[in-house]
Amino acid sequence: MKFVDSAKISVKAGDGGRGCVSFRREKFVPKGGPDGGDGGRGGHVYLRANRQLSTLLDFKYRKSYIAGRGEHGMGARKSGKNGNDVVIGVPCGTVVRNAETGEVLCDMVEDGQEIMIAKGGRGGQGNQHFATATRQAPRFAQPGEKGDEIELEMELKLMADVGLVGFPNAGKSTLISVFSAARPKIADYPFTTLVPNLGIVRYDDYKSFVMADIPGIIEGAAEGRGLGIQFLRHIQRTKTLLVMVPSDSADIAAEYATLLRELEKFDASLLSKPRLAVITKMDIAPEDFAIPELEPGIKVIAISSVAGQGLKALKDELWRQISTSTQITVDDAGN
């Protein structure tokens, strides 16, 4: 399935039905009073988060959602039926904005979370409501109100516990394939990963966490270079970051510093998240390879996904950070 993480749609709630102008006409009651019924309410439009969905692909093919119109009122005080509501399913992690103003309308985080995004118009009142002592036969009724109409911009930010960050060919996809059942494309050339991948990592029989692999970022990513910049938002919700540098890097410390700098340029709050430094591809490292200290207070773990070296220690440390994290994954600005 193609991965799509942004979309723009229009939604229109149903208009209310108009009230009825009618008068009671029965045998022996040739001049009965007004009995026009009310119009039905227009259908509402709702958004509902669904954990079974993982992409905004559907919105690339369907751009407009319109709820049902309320039925018009009828005689004999009969009200029209309400219009049919429309419920739009979105993946968990979808941020919804008003396309015109940029205002964040909702952040769909929890499975089953539902919000009314466009309210249906009220039905108009029938002429039965307008009879008075001096106006006993009103020949008018209310029209129905218009339903809300709005353009929406939707942006998906994946819900994961751990975000993998590294240059192309840092070994991110290999790690997630070893840790989980995810099967990303793996090859020995840059930008093998073209879309984010999610993997569920089993820690023991009853514990697990979600890991997100995004396309590799390069120096200048925050200014739009490479592929990773368009997917960096998918690590904004993570509880911890795994900053990965391969053992065969020409300058491990410089590469690590560049990665942190690109993260800070994109969103400075990313550096406030707990993180681990990981030296990958230890199976090809020379025997005298010395594990560097990359940053004060940040633990460095050396691994080989191919040989299985250091993976248990890495998994243990990730679980420790995740289980003790107080990271708030949804911010007020929807960033």
Curated annotation (Swiss-Prot):
<dbReference type="InterPro" id="IPR014100">
    <property type="entry name" value="GTP-bd_Obg/CgtA"/>
</dbReference>
<dbReference type="InterPro" id="IPR006169">
    <property type="entry name" value="GTP1_OBG_dom"/>
</dbReference>
<dbReference type="InterPro" id="IPR006074">
    <property type="entry name" value="GTP1-OBG_CS"/>
</dbReference>
<feature type="binding site">
    <location>
        <position position="193"/>
    </location>
    <ligand>
        <name>Mg(2+)</name>
    </ligand>
</feature>
<dbReference type="GO" id="GO:0005737">
    <property type="term" value="C:cytoplasm"/>
</dbReference>
<feature type="binding site">
    <location>
        <begin position="191"/>
        <end position="195"/>
    </location>
    <ligand>
        <name>GTP</name>
    </ligand>
</feature>
<keyword id="KW-0378">Hydrolase</keyword>
<feature type="binding site">
    <location>
        <begin position="213"/>
        <end position="216"/>
    </location>
    <ligand>
        <name>GTP</name>
    </ligand>
</feature>
<keyword id="KW-0479">Metal-binding</keyword>
<dbReference type="InterPro" id="IPR031167">
    <property type="entry name" value="G_OBG"/>
</dbReference>
<keyword id="KW-0460">Magnesium</keyword>
<dbReference type="InterPro" id="IPR027417">
    <property type="entry name" value="P-loop_NTPase"/>
</dbReference>
<dbReference type="Pfam" id="PF01926">
    <property type="entry name" value="MMR_HSR1"/>
</dbReference>
<comment type="subunit">
    <text>Monomer.</text>
</comment>
<dbReference type="Pfam" id="PF01018">
    <property type="entry name" value="GTP1_OBG"/>
</dbReference>
<dbReference type="InterPro" id="IPR045086">
    <property type="entry name" value="OBG_GTPase"/>
</dbReference>
<feature type="domain" description="Obg">
    <location>
        <begin position="1"/>
        <end position="159"/>
    </location>
</feature>
<keyword id="KW-0342">GTP-binding</keyword>
<dbReference type="GO" id="GO:0042254">
    <property type="term" value="P:ribosome biogenesis"/>
</dbReference>
<dbReference type="InterPro" id="IPR006073">
    <property type="entry name" value="GTP-bd"/>
</dbReference>
<feature type="binding site">
    <location>
        <begin position="304"/>
        <end position="306"/>
    </location>
    <ligand>
        <name>GTP</name>
    </ligand>
</feature>
<dbReference type="GO" id="GO:0005525">
    <property type="term" value="F:GTP binding"/>
</dbReference>
<protein>
    <recommendedName>
        <fullName>GTPase Obg</fullName>
        <ecNumber>3.6.5.-</ecNumber>
    </recommendedName>
</protein>
<dbReference type="GO" id="GO:0003924">
    <property type="term" value="F:GTPase activity"/>
</dbReference>
<feature type="domain" description="OBG-type G">
    <location>
        <begin position="160"/>
        <end position="323"/>
    </location>
</feature>
<feature type="binding site">
    <location>
        <position position="173"/>
    </location>
    <ligand>
        <name>Mg(2+)</name>
    </ligand>
</feature>
<dbReference type="GO" id="GO:0000287">
    <property type="term" value="F:magnesium ion binding"/>
</dbReference>
<keyword id="KW-0547">Nucleotide-binding</keyword>
<dbReference type="InterPro" id="IPR036726">
    <property type="entry name" value="GTP1_OBG_dom_sf"/>
</dbReference>
<feature type="binding site">
    <location>
        <begin position="166"/>
        <end position="173"/>
    </location>
    <ligand>
        <name>GTP</name>
    </ligand>
</feature>
<keyword id="KW-0963">Cytoplasm</keyword>
<feature type="binding site">
    <location>
        <begin position="280"/>
        <end position="283"/>
    </location>
    <ligand>
        <name>GTP</name>
    </ligand>
</feature>
<comment type="similarity">
    <text>Belongs to the TRAFAC class OBG-HflX-like GTPase superfamily. OBG GTPase family.</text>
</comment>
<comment type="function">
    <text>An essential GTPase which binds GTP, GDP and possibly (p)ppGpp with moderate affinity, with high nucleotide exchange rates and a fairly low GTP hydrolysis rate. Plays a role in control of the cell cycle, stress response, ribosome biogenesis and in those bacteria that undergo differentiation, in morphogenesis control.</text>
</comment>
